[in-house]
Amino acid sequence: MNTYKPYSERAKQHSNACARSLLELMERKQTNLSVAVDVTTKKELISIADAIGPYICVLKTHIDIVEDFDADLIQQLQELAKKHDFLFFEDRKFADIGNTVKHQYANGIYKIASWSHITNAHTVPGEGIIKGLAEVGLPLGRGLLLLAEMSSKGALTKGSYTTDSVEMARRNKDFVFGFIAQNKMNQYDDEDFIVMSPGVGLDVKGDGLGQQYRTPREVIVESGADVIIVGRGIYGQPDKLVEQAQRYRQAGWDAYLERLALHNK
């Protein structure tokens, strides 16, 4: 199964351009760490991105919470992405009809498609949401993740919702290259959906607001995900930013090497 192959091998075989770029980057930098930087000022976002950039494969943003957002922020972030070699994932969680999301993705003040390599969407509105986003994203070489499972307590993203989301992805593999999920989604030998898993923590199990945390090993080795998404465990400790980023990068990479050893004997 592709889930258990080296990232470099998967990159060579992958049909999706965005997935290839991500897998190649992960192998090149030896990191499967994505950091969710949910801060509300331009200064904080740039400062954190610069500090953790060397250790991540993906910087995950909620760009609409930045109170002093401007075009210069995007330009500075793009320069940091070149400097440190990482991709952007704007965690927009689109959830409207195709015609609406098309404009939300391309236009408005954020112009997400112009700078973010990866974005994501709920499948509640049906397949039209994928078609609308693809109209904008495909010509730019962007990639889409579907929200198949969430890490919050009581989430409704389970059962038939998850199953139907996977079927939608299979029908749109030119643009959809993976999922936000808690477990691997590949069921067939020729499938290679990349799974990015939020809710990863080494020190705590929850936050009192419904978030449930798992360790990098649980996520990568036991559940078969590919990228760990860490938020407050890194940016929540400003005096230990680099130390924590290095710690999670190492834990994630060690888990990946363990998975390779287990399945490629």
UniProtKB/Swiss-Prot annotation:
Query: Which Gene Ontology molecular-function terms are recorded?
Result: orotate phosphoribosyltransferase activity; orotidine-5'-phosphate decarboxylase activity
Give the annotated active site: 93 (proton donor)
So what EC number does this one have?
4.1.1.23
Please name the Gene3D superfamilies in this protein's record.
Answer: Aldolase class I (3.20.20.70)
Q: Which Pfam families match?
A: OMPdecase
Entry-linked SMART domains: OMPdecase
Q: Which InterPro entries match?
A: Aldolase_TIM, OMPdecase, OMPdecase_AS, OMPdeCOase_dom, RibuloseP-bd_barrel
Which annotated residues bind substrate? 38, 60-62, 91-100, 213, 232
Catalytic activity of the protein: orotidine 5'-phosphate + H(+) = UMP + CO2
Asked whether the UniProt record includes Cytoplasm among its keywords, one would answer no
PROSITE patterns the record matches: OMPDECASE
UniProt entry keywords in alphabetical sequence: Decarboxylase, Lyase, Pyrimidine biosynthesis
SUPFAM superfamilies attached here? Ribulose-phoshate binding barrel (SSF51366)
Please indicate if the UniProt record lists Lyase as a keyword. Answer: yes
Enzyme class at the top of the EC tree: lyase
User: What metabolic or biological pathway is this protein involved in?
Assistant: Pyrimidine metabolism; UMP biosynthesis via de novo pathway; UMP from orotate: step 2/2
What's a GO biological-process term for it?
'de novo' UMP biosynthetic process
Tell me its family. Answer: Belongs to the OMP decarboxylase family.
The identity of this protein, by name, is Orotidine 5'-phosphate decarboxylase
Please give the organism.
Rhizopus niveus
Gene behind the chain: PYR4
